[in-house]
A protein has these predicted regions:
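Short, basic/aromatic recognition patches
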Residues: 1-22
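Secretory/periplasmic and organellar redox-cofactor proteins
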Residues: 1-3, 13, 128-151
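Zn2+-dependent cytidine deaminase-like catalytic core
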Residues: 39-131
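Short glycine- and Lys/Arg-enriched binding-loop motifs that mark or flank ligand-binding interfaces
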Residues: 19, 24, 37, 82
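Short beta-strand scaffold segments in enzyme catalytic cores
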Residues: 27-35
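Active-site phosphate/pyrophosphate-handling residues
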Residues: 7, 36, 58
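Short secondary-structure junction motifs
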Residues: 22-26, 69-71
Length: 151
């Protein structure tokens, strides 16, 4: 992990902590363009009662309308689900940096097969926070993508 990726992943991790402290799923994301964060978000599925309010989706919504996303890098603490991966592909995001895929393998190969550069950091803090959440709140984890194939 280079220092630039480490710094932006720390910001995504801070977003995950916000969600965790609000009683939600600890998944955070930031969008970076030209070395600066243009948007930050976290999973709000529990807080908003919205099953589509994943961390990556919240981050994208906060970025607002844009004509192009090809110069944007998305940092996310957990490997993206099918919905979030599809959104990355739909909007042409060319690079995704992932904190961890141990607690949920996500769709790394799907992204790569469509030409997205994927960097997997295997970040110990991201892994530990998600493991802690799953142990503490398995019923919330099981509501969504947990244990399902191809999501």
């Amino acid at each position: 992990m280079n220092e630039i990726d480490r710094g932006f992943m720390r910001e995504a991790f801070q977003q995950a902590l916000i969600s965790y402290n609000e009683g939600g799923l600890p998944i955070g994301a930031v969008m970076v363009e030209n070395g600066a964060i243009i948007s930050a978000g976290h999973n709000r599925r529990v807080q908003d009662g919205d099953p589509t309010a994943h961390g990556e989706m919240d981050c994208l919504r906060k970025a607002g309308r844009r004509t192009r996303y090809d110069g944007v890098t998305l940092y996310t603490t957990l490997s993206p689900c099918m919905m979030c991966s599809g959104t990355v592909l739909q909007f042409g995001i060319k690079k995704v940096v992932i904190g961890e895929d141990r607690n949920f393998p996500g769709n790394i190969e799907l992204l790569r097969s469509h030409g997205v550069e994927v960097v997997l950091l295997d970040d110990p803090e991201c892994i530990a926070l998600m493991r802690r959440f799953i142990a503490e709140r398995p019923e919330l984890w099981d509501e969504d993508i947990a244990g399902r194939e191809n999501v």
